[in-house]
């Protein structure tokens, strides 16, 4: 059984009705992520993902999930494996206040995001916090520190940010569509380069 991405009741409640297309690192990037998250949680107790993930898109389409799944499956058929490379521990500043593991903009990662943007053009699927390919920061959220006071956030931000000399990397050959419904997380694994016969 796969580890869920979110587990706390408060997180599950806040995500109700939403869907996320994500990548799940499982090797080198996962290892450095877990070490960084453990270190961050040692400095403060804060909401955080239960499992590392790279979000490619967020949606709010609880009544059109099958339509959304069909579009993503079609996108995945033409998708090649994606190289993810961790390059730094960084932050999203206030008002978000999130410590992140920032990823390099590898050609395969940028292409996957851009191709998804193209697939979504002309649809009225509701996207959340969508950015252009140029403006999107590829990342894994480590902890969510939105409730920290400004001084405490400034200190955490300064202590967290650093470049990674080792540049851990791995290749991911599938995506997951994750959705939140009735207080629970659900997901479907979608391999790249394979046509589903559903």
Regions found by a protein language model. Name each.
Residues 1-85, 106-166, 184-198:
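Basic, often amphipathic N-terminal segments
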Residues 21, 101, 175-177:
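Hydrophobic beta-strand residues in large extracellular and virion-surface proteins
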Residues 53, 95-97:
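A short small-residue
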Residues 58, 102, 179:
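Pocket-edge structural micro-motifs
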Residues 82-84, 98-99, 138, 170, ...:
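A broad, low-specificity signal marking well-ordered, structured residues that form hydrophobic/aromatic
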Residues 89-95, 170-186, 194:
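Glycine-rich beta-strand-turn "strand-cap" elements at beta-sheet edges
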Residues 99-105:
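Short histidine-centered catalytic/ligand-binding loop motif
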């Amino acid at each position: 059984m796969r580890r869920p991405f979110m587990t706390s009741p408060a997180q599950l409640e806040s995500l109700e009705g939403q869907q996320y297309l994500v990548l799940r690192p499982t090797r080198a990037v996962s290892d450095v992520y877990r070490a960084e998250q453990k270190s961050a949680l040692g400095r403060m107790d804060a909401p955080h993902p239960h499992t590392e993930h790279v979000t490619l898109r967020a949606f709010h389409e609880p009544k059109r999930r099958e339509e959304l799944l069909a579009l993503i499956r079609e996108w995945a058929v033409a998708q090649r494996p994606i190289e993810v490379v961790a390059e730094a521990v960084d932050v999203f500043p206030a008002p978000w206040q999130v410590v992140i593991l920032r990823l390099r903009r590898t050609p395969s990662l940028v292409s996957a995001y851009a191709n998804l943007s193209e697939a979504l053009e002309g649809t009225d699927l509701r996207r959340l916090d969508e950015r252009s390919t140029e403006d999107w920061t590829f990342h894994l959220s480590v902890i969510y520190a939105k409730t920290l006071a400004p001084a405490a956030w400034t200190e955490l931000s300064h202590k967290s940010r650093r470049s990674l000399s080792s540049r851990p990397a791995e290749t991911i050959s599938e995506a997951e569509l994750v959705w939140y419904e009735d207080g629970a997380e659900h997901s479907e694994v979608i391999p790249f380069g394979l046509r589903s016969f559903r």
